[in-house]
C-alpha cells in the first residue's frame, strides 16, 4: 500500500451522497460544532454515542469507515504519546506499580478520555475533507469569514491559503511515495539500521522532495498569474453557494444530536 493510500488527510472522495450534496458551509459549521462539543465530554464511556454518530454520518456519506479512520494515521504517534503521558503522570490512586512507574486510576481515565477524543476529532475533521472538494472548502470558508472583511480581514486570501495547504498534502504524499520507490529500486536501504542510519538514508529523499515542492509552488503561482488571479475582489463563482432546506435540516439535526449527547452525559453522570 502506498503512502497516499495509507494517509487520507486532505484527500477528497467524490460520491453521490446526502453528505456530499450539502452546502460546504453546512458541513464546516457542523464539524466545528462537533469538534467544540467533544471537549465538553468528561466521561470516556459516553464517547460510544459519539462513535455511533460518526458511523451514521459515514454511512450517509458512502465513504468507507476504513478510509475515514485512516485519517488518524498521521497523528498516531501523538495519540500514543498523549495516552502514555496521561496514564503515567496523572496523580491519583495507584492501581499498578513497577519500580518508579506508577499508573493511577485517574491516569487511565484521562488517557482513555484524551485518546478517544483525539481519534474522534481527527475522524470528524477528516470526514469533512473527504466529502468536500478543495474548491467548495475555499468558497465555504470565504463565505463564513466574509463578515470579517469589514475590519479588513483578508477572508478570501486566508481561505485560499488553507485550501492550497490542504490540497498540497496528497501531492506531497504522492511525490514522497514516488521518490521512495525510485530510491528502493536503486538499492537504497531505508528501513535497516538504527535511527541515525535511517535519517541519513532519508536525505536523498528529502532533497528532491523539497525541489519538487518549490517547483509545484512556482507552477501554481504561474498558473494563477496567467489566469489574471487578483484575489477575491470582483470574483464570481460558477456555482454560487445557496442555503437549501436540506442544509437547515442537517444543521438542526446535528445541533439536536450534539445537545442530546451532552445532556445525556450530564443527566446520567
Swiss-Prot record:
- A GO cellular-component term linked to this record: plasma membrane
Write out the entry's keywords from A to Z: Cell membrane, Membrane, Transmembrane, Transmembrane helix, Transport
InterPro entries listed in its UniProt record? ABC/ECF_trnsptr_transmembrane (IPR003339), ECF_transporter_component (IPR051611), EcfT (IPR024919)
Q: State the annotated membrane topology for this chain.
A: Multi-pass membrane protein
Segments passing through the bilayer: 45-65, 75-95, 110-130, 153-173, 202-222, 244-264
GO molecular function list = transmembrane transporter activity
Pfam families xref list? CbiQ
Compartments in which it is found: Cell membrane
Belongs to which family? Answer: Belongs to the energy-coupling factor EcfT family.
Subunit info? Answer: Forms a stable energy-coupling factor (ECF) transporter complex composed of 2 membrane-embedded substrate-binding proteins (S component), 2 ATP-binding proteins (A component) and 2 transmembrane proteins (T component). May be able to interact with more than 1 S component at a time.
Provide the function of this protein.
Answer: Transmembrane (T) component of an energy-coupling factor (ECF) ABC-transporter complex. Unlike classic ABC transporters this ECF transporter provides the energy necessary to transport a number of different substrates.
Q: What is this protein called?
A: Energy-coupling factor transporter transmembrane protein EcfT
Its source organism is Thermanaerovibrio acidaminovorans (strain ATCC 49978 / DSM 6589 / Su883)
Amino acid at each position: 500500500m502506498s503512502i497516499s493510500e495509507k494517509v487520507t488527510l486532505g484527500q477528497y472522495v467524490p460520491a453521490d451522497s446526502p453528505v456530499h450534496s450539502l452546502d460546504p458551509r453546512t458541513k464546516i459549521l457542523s464539524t466545528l460544532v462537533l469538534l467544540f462539543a467533544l471537549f465538553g465530554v468528561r466521561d470516556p464511556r459516553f464517547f460510544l454515542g459519539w462513535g455511533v454518530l460518526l458511523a451514521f454520518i459515514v454511512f450517509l456519506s458512502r465513504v468507507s469507515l476504513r478510509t475515514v479512520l485512516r485519517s488518524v494515521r498521521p497523528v498516531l504517534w501523538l495519540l500514543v504519546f498523549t495516552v502514555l503521558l496521561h496514564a503515567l503522570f496523572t496523580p491519583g490512586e495507584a492501581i499498578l506499580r513497577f519500580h518508579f512507574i506508577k499508573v493511577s486510576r485517574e491516569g487511565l481515565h484521562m488517557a482513555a478520555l484524551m485518546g478517544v477524543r483525539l481519534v474522534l476529532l481527527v475522524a470528524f475533521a477528516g470526514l469533512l475533507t473527504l466529502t468536500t472538494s478543495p474548491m467548495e472548502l475555499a468558497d465555504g470558508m470565504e463565505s463564513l469569514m466574509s463578515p470579517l472583511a469589514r475590519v479588513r480581514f483578508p477572508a478570501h486570501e486566508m481561505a485560499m491559503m488553507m485550501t492550497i495547504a490542504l490540497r498540497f498534502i496528497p501531492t506531497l504524499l504522492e511525490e514522497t511515495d514516488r521518490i521512495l520507490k525510485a530510491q528502493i529500486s536503486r538499492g537504497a536501504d531505508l528501513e535497516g539500521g538504527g535511527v541515525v542510519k535511517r535519517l541519513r538514508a532519508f536525505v536523498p529523499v528529502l532533497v528532491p522532495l523539497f525541489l519538487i515542492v518549490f517547483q509545484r509552488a512556482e507552477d501554481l503561482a504561474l498558473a494563477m498569474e496567467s489566469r489574471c488571479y487578483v484575489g477575491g475582489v470582483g470574483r464570481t463563482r460558477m456555482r454560487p453557494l445557496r442555503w437549501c432546506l436540506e442544509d437547515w435540516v442537517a444543521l438542526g439535526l446535528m445541533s439536536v444530536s450534539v445537545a442530546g449527547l451532552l445532556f445525556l452525559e450530564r443527566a446520567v453522570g
